[in-house]
Each structure stands twice: as structure tokens, then as C-alpha cells.
Amino acid sequence: VTDSLKKALAAVEAALEKKAYDLVVLQVGHLSSIADFFIVATGRSDVQVQAISRGIEERMEREKERPTAIEGIKRGHWVVLDYNDVVIHVFFEPAREFYRLERNWTDAQEVALPEPYRSQVRDLTLRAIG
């Protein structure tokens, strides 16, 4: 397991602790120099999106990881937490449906997460990203 994947799993765990849902972890390192992994998660309100984002930030801080940038936390519709090799997108549900970020990364491989994470991960066969 790479350091990038460990970092991604820590972020996933933190997001789930704050009741994020519809999580997708995409391996994008072979497609882009931006990051190794993108994580996309959803919250049911702007307040929950903020709580998920802060939870991730706190967890990463405990792991001695510092963000390069955090954008959008004040509004809570689309928060981006950039940890260099792991970039996390936390969306308010309507914003995620509007932007459909995953459609830009159809060539990316979705990371099969172990339980207990898997039960909250979006099933690609049920997702319409067209």
C-alpha cells in the first residue's frame, strides 16, 4: 500500500465518520500529474459538507499532513481539499449532480475499498455519468 493510498484511506475514514455518502475514490495518477487519487464525497446539506471537510482536515492534521489549499469551505457547496497526491472533493448533493465531476475521469480506475468503506461507495454500474 502506497503512502498516497494510506492518505486517501485516512480521508475516506474521516469523511465516513461525518456521515459522507456516495464516496468514490479514483486512481488518476496515470492520467494526470495533478494527483494520484481523487476522492469525491457527498453531504446532504452545506453544513454537513463543511463538517465533512473539517473532519477530513482534522484527521489529516493528526496524520501530519498539511493541505496545499482548501477552497469553498465557507459556502459549503463544493469544497476542495488539496493534499498534493490526494485531492478531495466534498459536494452538497445538488452541486455534485450539477457538476458531475466523475464524468471527466471516465478513464480513471475506481479503487475497490475494503469494508467497512465499501458499503458507502457508489456502485459504478448504477451510476449514470454520461
Over which residues does each language-model region extend?
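Long, contiguous binding/interaction regions
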Residues: 1-30, 47-51, 58, 71-72, ...
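Active-site beta-strand termini and strand-to-loop segments that position acidic
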Residues: 81-83
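Short hydrophobic/aromatic beta-strand micro-patches
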Residues: 40-42
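Active-site phosphate-binding and catalytic loops of NTP-dependent enzymes
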Residues: 62-70
